[in-house]
Amino acid sequence: MTNIKLNYHKTHFLMSAPNIKVLPEDSGIEIAFAGRSNAGKSTALNALTQQKNLARTSKIPGRTQLINLFQVEPNCKLVDLPGYGYAAVPEQMKLQWQKSLGEYLQKRECLGGLVILMDIRHPLKDLDQQMIEWAVSADLPVLLLLTKADKLSQSARSKQVKMVREAILPFQGDVQVEAFSAQNKIGIERLSEKLDQWFSPLFS
């Protein structure tokens, strides 16, 4: 496998889509970021790219209602998916997001990996486990990012990472776990290395 190092700082916003019908051509490689509505997806994308406002963050969970695409390089895209779980929105809208999310995950051929973000203090909720289960059954590699790691002491953080690593063993598949904090720059390098690995087939 070719070793590559992409420059994520050059990432730029491409488009927002309410569903997969209006997404660009299904080609290249897309890496999707998924997680509960308050898991910190947008914050992680901003930290990775060193751009404060690339992905819009909000104090109100559930504001990412669309599929948002960002281009790293031609044929290399990052995708911010609608948050799942809690969101202070009408039920009808919530169902619409879930439909968009499900369609993207099931039908998008160029999906090359899934980054699932979970608050390190509340990991592996039911919907997170369903996501992991689905990805493993679809043969997709997964990186679990335990966000807001700065909220715990180093020993508590290590304990949580170990606990999650043990808890996911029954899922089998290619699932890795890392602590992450945008604020303290924990795990950003691990994330970019993993993305490089997933994008590398395009450069071989």
Curated annotation (Swiss-Prot):
Cofactor(s) listed: Mg(2+)
Any single Pfam family the record assigns to this protein: MMR_HSR1
Cellular component, GO annotation: cytosol
Keyword Ribonucleoprotein in record: no
Record's function text: Necessary for normal cell division and for the maintenance of normal septation.
Family: Belongs to the TRAFAC class TrmE-Era-EngA-EngB-Septin-like GTPase superfamily. EngB GTPase family.
NCBIfam families in alphabetical order: GTPase_YsxC (TIGR03598)
HAMAP family: GTPase_EngB (MF_00321)
Protein name listed in UniProt: Probable GTP-binding protein EngB
Organism: Histophilus somni (strain 129Pt)
